[in-house]
Amino acid sequence: MRRILAFFAVLATSAAMASAADGRWRPSPADGFDWQYVAPFDFSRPTSTLNLDAFDADPALIADLRRRGVKPICYVNVGAWEDWRPDRRQFPAAVMGKAYVGWEGERWLDVRRIDLLLPIMRARFRLCRDKGFLAVEPDNIDGFENETGFPISRAEQLRFNRAIAEAAHDLGLSIALKNAPELAAELADVYDFAIAEDCFKWDWCDMLQPFARQNKAVVAIEYPEDGRDPLKHCAEAAALSIQIVVKRRELDSWSRRCR
């Protein structure tokens, strides 16, 4: 047991030393998380981090958050095209896949075409950095498990996910593994923290333990739909070193969390 504890202590120390060496901020397991993408907003509520949309966020707001010690995290959709984004015409027809069922105006992207997609994603990450964000939350990095219109393999998805992590790190940004639990074991050494949607609802939170074992932050966004109370999982979350944040799916200012 002592050897095991010593091993994890070394991992935590190594992570802290790496952060100091590269100058990149990383959220810790103790940091509080929040997301606000749509009105009503409340930016006065205490939180350690705040996730905002890359294109919609005002640089003045980000600067104010940072003055108050809040670490801003930048939402970027890297795996699906959105028809309302200002850079939507930069995506060539060759990467446009099937409609993303349930999300109007979105289509899956062919992440096998790193040569075509990575320059666009680098530009988006650069926008995040220039606005003052400290990390990125890349969405839809699990296309290989979905009906995208392309025969994306697990290996090809991993290759894309590693490429965008490198792109973020090159700009001094931390990056979250969002969902994609089947890839967590292979990407925990590359990604800086993990975000999971409804992992307690669907019973896969334990698959993110490769992050927790490295003392990296793991946060579960749980949506209280169908009368479900996600806070009943607080004890289980604590045992897994996972923070629960309960949000409405539209991600306005409303939230609940474990005490």
Indicate where each model-derived feature is located:
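Bacterial N-terminal signal peptides
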Residues: 6-15
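Positively charged n-region of N-terminal signal peptides that target proteins for export
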Residues: 1-4
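Glycan-processing catalytic domains of CAZymes
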Residues: 21-259
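Sec/Tat signal peptide C-region and signal peptidase I cleavage site
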Residues: 16-20
